[in-house]
């Protein structure tokens, strides 16, 4: 596939202000991981500059090797039993009104990391009773009893990303699959928790396939959708097929809202947790 030139609208300014430096210090001093840095998120400068970050639990090594993701793959270290408390303390220090947590996949663990997830949410609530929480979870191999452990910890929003359209999913996701992800979304929604999902575009999908994902998500009870441009992390990752124009992103947002989503964040640099603090108003 030929190299596709990155357009001007994807150029970003990563400026570091005092709040950015403070956020970095808190994250580093608590030996925490963020998807902002491991995933090379283009919004890191903006978010850290506002004092927000998406914490990544379960370590920094993932057991899966999806072709779009920059997170390190390999054999993870044992879970840090102090991590849930360290995350909760960092949220307290950062005075966050809304916290976003995600994780690597831990297919090496008997419970795939579900109990660690539940403990982290509980610790956040214990130390930050006024802070709302959004968690971006893996599929837990579709095991409903493990998904339920996270649901029972009662975060305000649970997100699970479809990542891409049905046709491209097996090409870029190493273990997850489209049907299992829909099952996760359905279980979240059926338990009365606001369900959220996200996809990348620019992988070679067609607009009608994006609409199919929207319809599939709405049928499971999903309320919030994020759509952003796929950016190839390194030459070893899946190539960008196309850079979607800002106008097409706006069109996707309009279509999604008309179909019934409560909110659709759709722009080239949108990522799963972008403007997450604004999504809490769509809870319930």
Swiss-Prot record:
Keywords assigned by UniProt, alphabetized: 4Fe-4S, Cytoplasm, Iron, Iron-sulfur, Metal-binding, S-adenosyl-L-methionine, Transferase
GO cellular component terms, A-Z: cytoplasm
Main location: cytoplasm
Annotated residues for binding of [4Fe-4S] cluster 2: 62, 66, 69
Signal peptide extent: none
Taxonomic superkingdom: Bacteria
Single GO MF descriptor: metal ion binding
Localization annotation: Cytoplasm
Cofactor note: Binds 2 [4Fe-4S] clusters per subunit. One cluster is coordinated with 3 cysteines and an exchangeable S-adenosyl-L-methionine.
Enzyme Commission number(s) from the entry: 2.8.1.8
Pathway: Protein modification; protein lipoylation via endogenous pathway; protein N(6)-(lipoyl)lysine from octanoyl-[acyl-carrier-protein]: step 2/2
Residue ranges constituting the Radical SAM core domain according to the UniProt record: 48-262
Cross-referenced InterPro entries: Aldolase_TIM, Elp3/MiaA/NifB-like_rSAM, Lipoyl_synth, rSAM
A Pfam family annotated for this UniProt entry: Radical_SAM
Binding-site residues, [4Fe-4S] cluster 1: 36, 41, 47, 273
Similarity annotation: Belongs to the radical SAM superfamily. Lipoyl synthase family.
UniProt-recorded name of the protein: Lipoyl synthase
């Amino acid at each position: 596939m030929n190299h596709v030139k990155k357009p001007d609208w994807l150029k970003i300014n990563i400026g570091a202000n005092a709040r950015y430096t403070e956020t970095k210090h808190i994250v580093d001093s608590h030996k925490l991981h963020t998807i902002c840095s491991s995933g090379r998120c283009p919004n890191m400068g903006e978010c850290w500059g506002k004092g927000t970050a998406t914490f990544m639990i379960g370590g920094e090594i993932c057991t899966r090797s999806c072709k779009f993701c920059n997170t390190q793959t390999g054999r993870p270290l044992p879970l840090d039993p102090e991590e849930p408390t360290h995350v909760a303390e960092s949220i307290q220090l950062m005075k966050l009104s809304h916290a976003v947590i995600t994780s690597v996949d831990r297919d090496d663990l008997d419970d795939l990391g579900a109990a660690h997830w539940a403990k982290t949410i509980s610790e956040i609530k214990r130390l930050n009773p006024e802070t709302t929480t959004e968690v971006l979870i893996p599929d837990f191999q579709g095991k409903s009893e493990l998904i339920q452990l996270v649901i029972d910890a009662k975060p305000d929003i649970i997100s699970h990303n479809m990542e891409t359209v049905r046709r491209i999913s097996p090409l870029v996701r190493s273990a997850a699959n489209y049907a299992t992800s829909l099952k996760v979304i359905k279980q979240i929604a059926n338990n009365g928790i606001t369900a959220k999902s996200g996809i990348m575009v620019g992988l070679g999908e067609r607009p009608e396939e994006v609409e199919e994902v929207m319809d599939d998500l709405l049928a499971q009870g999903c309320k919030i959708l994020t759509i952003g441009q796929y950016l190839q992390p390194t030459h070893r990752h899946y190539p960008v097929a196309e850079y979607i124009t800002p106008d097409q992103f706006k069109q996707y947002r309009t279509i999604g809202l008309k179909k019934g989503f409560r909110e659709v964040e759709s722009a080239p640099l949108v990522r799963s947790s972008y403007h997450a603090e604004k999504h809490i108003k769509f809870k319930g």
